[in-house]
Amino acid sequence: MKKIFSSKKLILCALCALVISISSCASAGKLQAPPMEADSAGWVVYWDWERGVREAQQQKPATLVVFAANFAEDGSLVLPAELTAEHLAQLPADKAYLSFVNDQHKGEQTLMKDTTVLKKLLNKKKSREQHIAEIIALCKQYNFAGVEIDYENIWRDKALMNNFAAFITELREKTQAENLKLRVVLEPRTLRFAEELPGNVEYVVMFYNLYGGHSGPGPKADRRFIWHTLSQAAKLPGTPNVAFANGGFDWTATRKAKSLTQVQAVALQKKYHVEPERDENSRALHFSYDDGKEKHTVWYADEQTLIYWQELAQAVGFKRISIWRLGGNELPK
């Protein structure tokens, strides 16, 4: 597998990005990222750990993010059972972050991206301090070099957004005191509150989910979506990091879209003997097939897609790139 984390620009992609920057958006010529050092990061997820670690060893991103700690039913932080100390020891401690997400276990269920637990924890300074202390203790316990906060759906509630900004300000001070790095993941819709967030923080903006399980068929990102989100990310008071997602989805008329890795998408192409087409506006691949029961439509991002997306960001100075995710991208030779 070719490296998708690369600071070397492909000439063709650079030329394409330059042409687009001039012609596709009236304000593109004015768009410029703040000064920043280059960085590459990839997420390693607990449900695909071995493949993720293997790809991390091949790709060698500068930063690795372990996904993820979440909330027990009582509101305390826990690691998935699959993430043992032995697993975590496979990663270089000096480049690994632990991600924290607002998923909470409730009996046999897991509430995904739940804001109820956040409203309780972030509402008052004392509860924020306790939450921060628990975050730092968990990172110290497993020798992580940094903290990643990935709390989603906060943009839906203005009061929660205000408390989140206070939480990040306080967390920034505590992580600095403990010699821990900090990055904060933001959904594109959260960028409307960019000016309310504290400075001196790395903000990882999700440049994906344009299409997905919530919509009909299409790419995770396209040129217009990337340009628009870059223009919003440039307003952040901290250092923006651009996060792209590989893989894709399989849609049918009767079921919710199913998430696919690149390996799974290519396997479907081979099984049903179909050739994908590459979309001009996103450079994503797409194809359709019939499994004998119903028609399917698949869109996914491959290496060429990711390189194109990165070039769009790098052309205007965004040099910190994260990839969701490592694992499921190794194609048979």
PLM region spans:
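Active-site groove signature of glycoside hydrolases
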Residues: I132-M161, F207-N209
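Short, acidic/polar
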Residues: V45-Q58, K125-K140, E187-A194, D302-L312
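Substrate-binding surface in catalytic domains of secreted glycosidases
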Residues: A41-W43, E73-E82, N162-K271
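Conserved, mostly hydrophobic/aromatic
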Residues: L64, I149, Y203, V242, ...
